[in-house]
Every structure is written in structure tokens, then in C-alpha cells.
């Protein structure tokens, strides 16, 4: 009797083991949606790049789509229009109505505005960049070209941030840590130069192999044109080199010469302009239209400084930049 029971239990356990191993083996396959791409397909087809790259690019300078709400326009107004634009005299508030004139235009920094500047200048750049880094650099066959474009885009957004805030979290971002140390502005700038240099090298090598474009759907600025990305990166490298010329003359000269001597060169034509491209099936609207339009925010007017320069030099662009309201 005992022998029979043992045999029955043994058979049952064996069957259970077979069922378990079979169900475990098939579980992932059974739960796949046959109508959606899996991760391997998404990486091969550039689906994920097409999701995150445009999101990164539209936050370099906050540029809303026509279908967006006013969040990006408000971010642009607080972090750019009522900040640097006002300080250098390009624009001036029509009515300094915010917080009884105690705001950035009068060099008063409220916590709410500063936090918003930080969020849109740093958090919204790093979030899609981290995804792009993981997508393009974590497999056996990394997509170095797309990552190079992501690097250039990241630096385009963040060089303004370190100029505003000084030290920022940078070198350790994206490494999976819950807390990230702040890097000095000098350290951040040195990383900028190194990363731009590497990005240009990657894209130039790609170009020399007779490859002039990356997937267009993933890039709403240059629609995948590698040579234009190289010119933008070199121009950005030159800009940053000029900014550090008094802090580190040798560093500035090194990277200024790298930018100028690159065979592709720097931006010299309006065709090289970096902008959200309408040809990428996107309808964008510049925040200044909404900020200055009398029928919308009606908050901004020409600044005295730029008026003096443009009138003094009889600059013909003045009628394109500004309209006389009478």
C-alpha cells in the first residue's frame, strides 16, 4: 500500500513538474501582444527614438506644439523672456504685474519661479535623454549616431542651465542612483567639450562611410541630416569655447580650433538653422507670439536697448522683429 501511494505521489509530482516547466516556458510567449512591437522590434525600427528624441528637442528651448497647453509658453516666459531677454534689453514687460513687480525683471528670485526654471531647464532635458541613452547604448549593437545627436541636444539645453545655476547635477545623471552629486561649472563645461568632440567624431565617421542621414522620424530638427548636426555641434563647441576664454585660455583655444578646423565646419548659412521642423509633421508655435500678442497674453514689448541699436544702425530687420502698435 505504501509503495503504491509513493508511486502515485511520484507520478503526480512529475506531472506537476512537467506542467510547471511548460507553463513557465510558454508564459512570456502567451502574454505577448501579437499586434504590438516587442522591445527588440522597437529598437530595430527606431520606434522608441521617435518617441523620446522629439521630446528632448522641443525642450532645448521650450517650444509648444499647436496641440499643447500653455505650460511650455509659461516656462519660456518665466525662464527666458522675463529673465535674460529682459536683463539685456531685448524685451520689456508691458506691465510688470507679477508679484507687485518683485520678480526676475527686478532681480527678485521667487522660489516658485526658480523651481520652474530648474524643472524645465534640467529635469525635462535629462528625462528623455536618459531614455535615449538606455535605448541606444545598452545593447550589443549600440546606435552611436542617434546617441551622438542626443548628446548634442542635451548640451544645447543644459549649457544655459549651468550658466544660470552654476553647479548642476550632470556627470552622474543616468547612472541609476537615487541621489546625484552636483558638479562644478568648470567640470560641467569640460564634460560638454569632451562629449561634443566625441559626438562630432562619431557623426563624421558615419558620414565618411557614405551615410548622410539617420532615421528622419527620430529627428524633428534636421530630419536626420548628419552634416547639419556636425555643423551645429561645431558651432556650439565654438560658442562654449568663447565663453571660457577668460577662465581657461588654453582650453578655449583647443576647442575653438577643433570646431573651426573640422572638415564639415560650422554653421554659415540660414539652411543650417536649428529649429523644430514643420516638415516632420509637427505644427509648432513660438512662445513669443502668445506672450506678446495683444489678443493673448499681451505681456511683452520691445526693450529700450535693442531699439537703440536697431534704430541707431538703421537695421532693416526692425520691422520684422517688432510691430508699431501706434
What positions do the PLM features span?
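Structured, solvent-exposed acidic/aromatic patches
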Residues: 43-47, 93-326
Amino acid at each position: 500500500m505504501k509503495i503504491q501511494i509513493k508511486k502515485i505521489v511520484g507520478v503526480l509530482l512529475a506531472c506537476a513538474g512537467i506542467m510547471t516547466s511548460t507553463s513557465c516556458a510558454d508564459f512570456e510567449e502567451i502574454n505577448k501582444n501579437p499586434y504590438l512591437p516587442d522591445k527588440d522590434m522597437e529598437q530595430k525600427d527606431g520606434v522608441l527614438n521617435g518617441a523620446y528624441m522629439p521630446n528632448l528637442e522641443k525642450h532645448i528651448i521650450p517650444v509648444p506644439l499647436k496641440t499643447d497647453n500653455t505650460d511650455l509658453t509659461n516656462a519660456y516666459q518665466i525662464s527666458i523672456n522675463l529673465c535674460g531677454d529682459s536683463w539685456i534689453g531685448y524685451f520689456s514687460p508691458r506691465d510688470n504685474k507679477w508679484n507687485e513687480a518683485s520678480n526676475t525683471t527686478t532681480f527678485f528670485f521667487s522660489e516658485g519661479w526658480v523651481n520652474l526654471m530648474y524643472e524645465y531647464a534640467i529635469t525635462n532635458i535629462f528625462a528623455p535623454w536618459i531614455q535615449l541613452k538606455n535605448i541606444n547604448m545598452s545593447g550589443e549593437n549600440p546606435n552611436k549616431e542617434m546617441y551622438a545627436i542626443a548628446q548634442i541636444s542635451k548640451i544645447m539645453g543644459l549649457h544655459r542651465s549651468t550658466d544660470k545655476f552654476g553647479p548642476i547635477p550632470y556627470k552622474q545623471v543616468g547612472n541609476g542612483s537615487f541621489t546625484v552629486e552636483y558638479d562644478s561649472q568648470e567640470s560641467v563645461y569640460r564634460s560638454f567639450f569632451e562629449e561634443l568632440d566625441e559626438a562630432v567624431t562619431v557623426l563624421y565617421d558615419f558620414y565618411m562611410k557614405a551615410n548622410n542621414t539617420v532615421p528622419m522620424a527620430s529627428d524633428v530638427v534636421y530630419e536626420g541630416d548628419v552634416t547639419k548636426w556636425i555643423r551645429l555641434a561645431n558651432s556650439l563647441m565654438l560658442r562654449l569655447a568663447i565663453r571660457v576664454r577668460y577662465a581657461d585660455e588654453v582650453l578655449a583655444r583647443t576647442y575653438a580650433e577643433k570646431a573651426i578646423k573640422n572638415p564639415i565646419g560650422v554653421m554659415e548659412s540660414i539652411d543650417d538653422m536649428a529649429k523644430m521642423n514643420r516638415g516632420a509633421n509637427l505644427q509648432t508655435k513660438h512662445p513669443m507670439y502668445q506672450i506678446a500678442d495683444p489678443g493673448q497674453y499681451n505681456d511683452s514689448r520691445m526693450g529700450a536697448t535693442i531699439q537703440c541699436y536697431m534704430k541707431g544702425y538703421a537695421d532693416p530687420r526692425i520691422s520684422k522683429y517688432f510691430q508699431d502698435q501706434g
